């Protein structure tokens, strides 16, 4: 199964659906779903996902290189792994999504959207995670969902962590720093993301990794993510990652800007970078007689997008943590 990406993009079902790799067994489950199981017993399970948005190709290419290293035997596998290429049709078309944003649908929220390829895929991925986690007795469960951002950022690589009732484990946060993440953003409320679903329903330590900017296939400079690729390789093979890194800055979400109607106006232009700072009192958005302003001394914007569909998030406002 050294052509997993090509099969996924072409929508082709492989003639052989399971086999042996270098020290592991592989099993093709469905388009964009591949299970890897080490020959030796392990108590760690990992979801490695990318391509939830079809125009975010750099992480997909990174995963393809990791799979090639595993199949060649140059990388040892020490986790049970479910590799997920989230939205095959959008990936093949080179678009963010075909009908609706899948990363708003998880946790059963797909039932609130008009039926589409994305709603069916979200349901399939939920069932796939349930089967994967329930078929083993993993003591450690991680989910790393790899993305790229629509626009540029003051932090080239950053992580977004779902709301979680329990404290985050220090080794997980340390690994995120070793993977080159310059900032970590902590959600304070539930959401429909893939990582919130895996965290809430399966207790996984989950993070959305934002790696650079969305570009088409074969136009990505993967060298700018070498530190992340090296950390992923070390993780898969059970090797300790470097401790010589600067701890990521930490932010938490303090509010969400939501577009409710065509009267919505977001006062940020296309050049506004993620993590741009705004002073207290700054007018951020208006919709009819409703005004959205900065309420803390300083707030930072994340994912500003004035053109989202009505009812969806047009941006998050953050505050820095000590």
From Swiss-Prot:
CDD domains for this protein: M14_ASTE
Pathway note: Amino-acid degradation; L-arginine degradation via AST pathway; L-glutamate and succinate from L-arginine: step 5/5
Gene Ontology terms: biological process: arginine catabolic process to glutamate; arginine catabolic process to succinate
GO-annotated molecular function: hydrolase activity, acting on ester bonds; succinylglutamate desuccinylase activity; zinc ion binding
Catalytic activity: N-succinyl-L-glutamate + H2O = L-glutamate + succinate
Cysteine pairings via disulfide bonds: none
Classification via InterPro entries: AspA/AstE_fam, AstE_AspA_cat, Aste_AspA_hybrid_dom, SuccinylGlu_desuccinylase
EC number: 3.5.1.96
EC class name: hydrolase
Name listed for the protein in its UniProt record: Succinylglutamate desuccinylase
The species this protein was found in: Salmonella enteritidis PT4 (strain P125109)
Taxonomic lineage from the root: Bacteria, Pseudomonadati, Pseudomonadota, Gammaproteobacteria, Enterobacterales
